């Protein structure tokens, strides 16, 4: 069984946590994140260490305990280092470009798909077939990357589509003729 909730979170230099009635604000060099946590979970800040405690050992409290600790750690990492999801496009004529804060995708449709960057998330297009989704909130970076991928997810026959860098796409054999 996982014991993630019992691990202590160590704050890097330049990161500050303010806990007021389980509404936690984390400030760091990359920005600020605020999130409300369950009232039953105790969050204590002592110097550069943050501990998360639970009132009892019920199954519900154990799950909330681990999730709270993981979310809090993601906030600390986000404001100090940030998060990045890299996507790659494979297919003839598939390309991406930036227009202001919008991501414009040509993925084999009769029209171009436009994706507006949500608040706190930015797009980077180092090459026409590579997209980086960058931000301080892990949840919104992951959701935005998943949405971009869903516009043309990789198909199993030729492998065309948008995929995460390093993602394995299982290939199928096509029909055989008579």
Curated annotation (Swiss-Prot):
Keywords: Ribonucleoprotein, Ribosomal protein, RNA-binding, rRNA-binding. This protein binds to the 23S rRNA, and is important in its secondary structure. It is located near the subunit interface in the base of the L7/L12 stalk, and near the tRNA binding site of the peptidyltransferase center. This is Large ribosomal subunit protein uL6. The keyword rRNA-binding applies. It comes from Streptococcus agalactiae serotype V (strain ATCC BAA-611 / 2603 V/R). Pfam families: Ribosomal_L6. GO terms for biological process: cytoplasmic translation. Belongs to the universal ribosomal protein uL6 family. GO terms for molecular function: rRNA binding; structural constituent of ribosome. Part of the 50S ribosomal subunit. The keyword Ribonucleoprotein applies. SUPFAM superfamilies: Ribosomal protein L6 (SSF56053). GO terms for cellular component: cytosolic large ribosomal subunit. HAMAP family: Ribosomal_uL6_B (MF_01365_B).
């Amino acid at each position: 069984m996982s014991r993630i909730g019992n691990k202590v979170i160590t704050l890097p230099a330049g990161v500050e946590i303010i806990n007021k009635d389980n509404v936690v604000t984390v400030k760091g060099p990359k920005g600020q994140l605020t999130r409300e946590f369950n009232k039953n979970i105790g969050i204590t800040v002592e110097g550069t260490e943050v501990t998360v405690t639970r009132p009892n050992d019920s199954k519900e409290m154990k799950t909330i305990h681990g999730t709270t600790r993981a979310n809090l750690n993601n906030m600390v990492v986000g404001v100090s280092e940030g998060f990045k999801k890299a996507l790659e496009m494979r297919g003839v004529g598939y390309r991406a470009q930036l227009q202001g804060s919008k991501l414009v995708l040509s993925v084999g449709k009769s029209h171009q798909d436009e994706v507006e960057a949500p608040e706190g998330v930015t797009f980077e297009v180092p090459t026409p077939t590579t997209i980086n989704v960058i931000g301080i909130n892990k949840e919104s970076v992951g959701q935005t990357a998943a949405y971009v991928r869903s516009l043309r997810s990789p198909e199993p026959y030729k492998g065309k589509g948008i995929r995460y860098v390093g993602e394995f796409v299982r290939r199928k054999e096509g029909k055989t003729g008579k």
